[in-house]
Amino acid sequence: MLRLKNDRFIRALLRQPVDRTPVWIMRQAGRYLPEYRQLREKVPNFMAFCKTPELACEATLQPLRRFPLDAAIIFSDILTIPDAMGVDLHIAPTVGPVIRNPVRSAQDVNRLQMPAVEEALSYLFDAIRLTVKALDHRVPLIGFAGSPWTLACYMTEGQSSKTFLTARAMLYQQPDVFHTLLQKLTTLTIAYLNAQIKAGADVVMLFDTWGGLLTPSLYRQFSLDYLSQIAAEVVRQKNGRKIPLIFFTKNGGQWLESIANSGCDAVGLDWTTDIGQARRRVGDRVALQGNLDPAILLSNPESISTAAVDILKSYGQGSGHVFNLGHGIDPSTPIENVAALVEAVQNFSIKNEEPINSYYR
């Protein structure tokens, strides 16, 4: 098995020495890139794009041609699992995801399909295999899924929302039904991530975008317990190498210790948490990823560089930090500002501790 030419991202996730802080960007493949917008015109809708392996592979590679990033993330969408379960999913250009048959009763949950993941979502695994070949071991490839709670939010609400009131009300009105839905999603997510690893993903990540909407008790019951189940059952070793697992709960800083104890290797932070304080809270249990406010990328290179250095200083010396945004990059972000961010992180964080490819010896 050939080793990666640049493995500092994996080394940082495992809290091993690195020569500098690795950097990648959530939604680094996407609408802020003119070449992506041109590529997107080849198909009539977003899900058709995701389901075309050659296009998904090309979109994954595009940001690496512009910026010296330390990881690639496969181009896909978190709603691929609900789509495979038979919900009537439509991605509206100005609205976002719309599910025309929302799941709001025991009967609705029972009607959901439990497909063979490797067949129903084969397009994603084909895209991963194409991307792994194209990357030629240059950087690690991240696979991902949405958390069961976040997927259930869209499936029950029927569309995106700032509050997901329908989903949250169901937790109180029909808790058993909601748990049944979450368990189905968890079972499929485990199979989905394992199939991504089998196809060639080096790291996997779970996006719990809406976990921060919950009370502490409900977060544990309806989100974190299922994340912990996934952590326990996802493949964590392949060909003698560890497959790191990242959990990201937006607005989850108040539960940082609990997330760190859930079985993941790294915790993603949004911009509302001080990363230096977060490091002191978790100690050496997990690595941390984040956590620049995406809004600052709409300012200017000087402000971006200052803010990036502030985060690096707050984290302090040593490994265990992956630089990223605190959420996905905004589509209106100027490309030159992304370049300024990557350059600032790389220039400030050089540590010269060990050769970067020693993990794969």
UniProtKB/Swiss-Prot annotation:
Substrate binds at residues 27-31, 77, 154, 209, 327. GO terms for cellular component: cytosol. Keywords: Cytoplasm, Decarboxylase, Lyase, Porphyrin biosynthesis. GO terms for molecular function: uroporphyrinogen decarboxylase activity. It catalyses: uroporphyrinogen III + 4 H(+) = coproporphyrinogen III + 4 CO2. CDD domains: URO-D (cd00717). Pathway: Porphyrin-containing compound metabolism; protoporphyrin-IX biosynthesis; coproporphyrinogen-III from 5-aminolevulinate: step 4/4. Its main location: cytoplasm. Its EC number is 4.1.1.37. One of its GO terms (biological process) is protoporphyrinogen IX biosynthetic process from glutamate. InterPro entries: UROD/MetE-like_sf, Uroporphyrinogen_deCO2ase_HemE, Uroporphyrinogen_deCOase. The record marks 77 as: Transition state stabilizer. It is found in: Cytoplasm. Homodimer. Belongs to the uroporphyrinogen decarboxylase family. Catalyzes the decarboxylation of four acetate groups of uroporphyrinogen-III to yield coproporphyrinogen-III. This is Uroporphyrinogen decarboxylase. It comes from Coxiella burnetii (strain Dugway 5J108-111). The gene is hemE.
